[in-house]
Amino acid sequence: MSEQLIERIRNKDQLAMNQLYREYIGLLSSVCYRYVPMEDDVKDILQNSFIKIFTSISALEYRGEDAFRNWMVRVVVNEALLFLKNRKKLQYTDVGTATLQQIADEGEPEIERLSSAELHQLISELPDGYRTVVNLYVFEGYSHKEIAKLLNKSENTVSSLLQRGRKKLKTILEKEGYV
């Protein structure tokens, strides 16, 4: 992603917008599916996200491709969270940082042995709220404090939800035969 392409988007160049869309739709779709499993909902969220990206890009200071990609991912995550809040299905739960060890209790080494694909599959079986918090913690790297702020909950609430989420994930592990 070049600064020149971003400048063209700032100047409302439709071809540049299409190029950005084509380059990042795969990544942003997979991020969105972590939070919302329904294809139609994902399409709506991505449409809103790209509108926000294209309208906000003029105020963005370009700091390299990685920073730009991370900014777009944050836009999609925020739009997905807003969608879930508006549906009033959030039941907030599991929280952590970015490794399997961080969501596993000492007595749950089976979580640490899962591949990333297996973990994604298991987390996708969690209810919306649980899935949202697990994704924020494990895959997006948010801290308890950041999740609490994002979801408008106290840190203590987020911590207790983490424990319940771990139990729910362990139940799924047992059901799927991992334990």
List PLM regions with ranges.
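N-terminal module of bacterial RNA polymerase sigma factors
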Residues: 1-27, 124, 145, 171, ...
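Internal acidic/polar
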Residues: 2, 90-116
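Sigma70-family region 2
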Residues: 10-11, 50-65, 87
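Short, charged helix-capping/linker segments at alpha-helix termini
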Residues: 10-18, 29-48, 63, 155, ...
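Short helix-capping/turn signature of helix-turn-helix
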Residues: 23-26, 34-35, 135-142
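Structural recognition of an alpha-helix C-terminal capping motif at a helix-to-coil junction
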Residues: 30, 44-51, 55, 66-78
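Arg/Lys-rich amphipathic alpha helix in sigma70-family domain 2
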Residues: 59, 73-94
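DNA-recognition helix of helix-turn-helix
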Residues: 81, 130, 139, 145, ...
